[in-house]
UniProtKB/Swiss-Prot annotation:
Name of the protein this chain belongs to: Imidazoleglycerol-phosphate dehydratase
Keywords linked to the UniProt accession: Amino-acid biosynthesis, Cytoplasm, Histidine biosynthesis, Lyase
UniProt gene name: hisB
GO biological process, one term: L-histidine biosynthetic process
Subcellular location per the Swiss-Prot or TrEMBL entry: Cytoplasm
Family indicated by similarity: Belongs to the imidazoleglycerol-phosphate dehydratase family.
Amino acid sequence: MRKSEIERETKETYVKILLNLDGSGSFLGDFPVPYYKHLFSAFCFYAEWDVEIMAKGDVEVDPHHLIEDTGIVWGKAFYSAVSNSNFLRFSSKIVPMDEALVMAVVDISGRPYLEIRDDKGILNGRLIKEFLRGFVNNSQITLHIWLLSGENLHHIEEAIFKALGLALGEASKEVPNLKSTKGKIW
């Protein structure tokens, strides 16, 4: 099975993630920022990954460090779990949530790149960008997020995690042969 366990400890945070890419969509553990626990649960549910997390940090100062470090650890866990398997590689999904409409396009490429198209600047200064940047850089995927419409930040961010879960869940599915003109990704 495609599993990994990664942990990171700094003076500001401690994050440990156990990831099973061939799971059922469960998110277990204690995450001290309830809103992000909600978003991470949706991510796992739609990706059909099992994730167990142990996390603590200086959230009384600001949750920035913990959200960013969670992205870093989750990205490393994904890379570790997927890198020795053959996977579909590409996927794109469009997800509505009420007035919000978000598209996520992924390539498990070995080349980290994050593009967030947000013409109205709705996500400027939001912690979701820190999570995504940490995840993308450490999982070595290419990710495009397009905010097609929306005004409610909760709806937009939840649609992002649902679209990302659906797209990455599909792109990481095992297949007989890896599609790459180079013959390999990593």
